[in-house]
Amino acid sequence: MEKRLRLAPSPTGLFHIGTARTALFNWLYAQKIGGKFLIRIEDTDFLRSKSEYTKNILEGLKWLGLKWDEEPIKQSDRISIHKSYIKKLLECGAAYRCFTSEDEISELREEQKKKGLPPKHDNRHRSLSKEEIETFISQGRTSVIRFKIDEKIEIKWIDQIRGEIKWQGKDLGGDLVLSRRAKGYEIGDPLYNLAVVVDDNFMNITHVVRGEDHISNTAKQILIYKALNFNLPTFSHTPLILNSEGKKLSKRDCVTSIDEFREMGYLPEALSNYMAFLGWSPKSADREILSLEEISKIFDLSEINKAGAKFSWEKLNWINSQYIKNIESIKLIEIMRKYWDDNGWKPPSEEWANKLAILIRDSMTLLKDSIDQSKPFFLIPTIQKEGQDFLEIRESKLSLKLILNYLIEKNTIKLNKEKAKEIINEISKKHNIKKGILMKSLRVAFFGSLSGPDLIQSWELFAESKTDRTRIERCL
């Protein structure tokens, strides 16, 4: 039997990191067991669902490298099919029309609140006669369709992450609403729990992997599966992603959408690598930097933790920095060039751009760090106070004068790393100036401060862009 998994996001907002991790776990497990990874867009919330969010989700999946195996389906295209199954449940007596008004439901909840009881429908219309139904309809009252839940029943299943889970019928909030309100004998638009079961069955889904916030929904859905004589899939409920305070990660935590991570300068490979270990502790992994292909070979749902997983910016940043260090230079330059173009910076040659990328990559945590790291190579920076103070040292300006005179005198030389070292050594010996003074003086001239990337490699780049002399001259 073919193994089939799915991601079923609701397009009511931007692609969230929680949804992305669920997608990743589904994709990894599908790869591990030789199954298929499918997409279903659950867009039955017509007020909040938007096509731009659907597009955003699909583009986010592509960016993360999570390819699906069949054309995505939209739940909204299958409303008539969902209604036909609600009709079957009505006909077999597993569901009924409920005419309880919104005001009556509010009154019931107020009473329960006063008594300290959880909100729960009292199933008052479960046994209406045909005459009573016709009376309500003639009065113009609208109805929802409710699915009967036996309060004495115990629902249990073996969860691949959590082991055996038990749920009591009495704790499910009363008979389950399957459809929105409608007039007469019409059936309103189907709601989440019914549509999910019908569509998972239609798609032949064998494994459902989703967040732990769906556990109560699973209990309800199992009852619908059984009422419709559908085969039950295997369920797995992943832990929530938590913020630093141990609370569920939300929009209040600033960055939650994949778009935001992308704009901040995270590589998709790094974000996927980090998300894979967010709540999963593999026994067989001997290192933390792994490709999706490598992760899929060792991925095991049973090793996913039950407790919530705290999001760590420090860990994500470290992983991203490792990927930046090891990314192909051509790809890194391509990414950097977008930042350079945005700032109107043009490298003098491809070779120069390649040398710059290699020089600054080890200092980068995020891709956008390339802006600050590249800036002093395109623009001459202002000399900071620490640099100005250092230039007050007599030997500092003398060092720069001697270096400048050497460059003017040897105008025809092509300065490379070896030649740069030779110049420093020669001047140091000839004029009895410490190399440290010479190099710090140059650093101030080039970068405006006493810090920066490798000086010798930087000098080679400044020489190629013909700005090394200009930078030295301004200090004299």
Curated annotation (Swiss-Prot):
What is any one GO biological process for this UniProt entry?
glutamyl-tRNA aminoacylation
Task: Provide the catalytic activity annotation.
Answer: tRNA(Glu) + L-glutamate + ATP = L-glutamyl-tRNA(Glu) + AMP + diphosphate
Primary site of residence: cytoplasm
What the entry lists under CDD domains is as follows:
GluRS_core
Going by the UniProt record, its keywords in alphabetical order are: Aminoacyl-tRNA synthetase, ATP-binding, Cytoplasm, Ligase, Nucleotide-binding, Protein biosynthesis
The EC number of this protein is 6.1.1.17
Q: Where in the cell is it found?
A: Cytoplasm
Q: Which GO terms describe its molecular function?
A: ATP binding; glutamate-tRNA ligase activity; tRNA binding; zinc ion binding
Question: Record's InterPro entries?
Answer: aa-tRNA-synth_I_cd-bd, aa-tRNA-synth_I_codon-bd_sub2, aa-tRNA-synth_I_CS, aa_tRNA-synth_I_cd-bd_sf, Glu-tRNA-ligase_bac/mito, Glu-tRNA-synth_I_codon-bd_sub1, Glu/Gln-tRNA-synth, Glu/Gln-tRNA-synth_Ib_cat-dom
Residues engaged in binding ATP: K251
Motif extent ('KMSKS' region): 248-252
Nucleotide-binding is among the record's keywords: yes
Query: Is Ligase among this UniProt entry's keywords?
Result: yes
Signal peptide range equals: none
Cellular component (GO) terms are: cytosol
Q: What HAMAP family has UniProt attached to this entry?
A: Glu_tRNA_synth_type1 (MF_00022)
The record's family statement is:
Belongs to the class-I aminoacyl-tRNA synthetase family. Glutamate--tRNA ligase type 1 subfamily.
Q: What does this protein do?
A: Catalyzes the attachment of glutamate to tRNA(Glu) in a two-step reaction: glutamate is first activated by ATP to form Glu-AMP and then transferred to the acceptor end of tRNA(Glu).
Q: How does it assemble?
A: Monomer.
Q: What is this protein called?
A: Glutamate--tRNA ligase
What is the organism field in this record?
Prochlorococcus marinus (strain MIT 9301)
Give the organism's phylogenetic lineage: Bacteria, Bacillati, Cyanobacteriota, Cyanophyceae, Synechococcales
Q: Which gene encodes it?
A: gltX
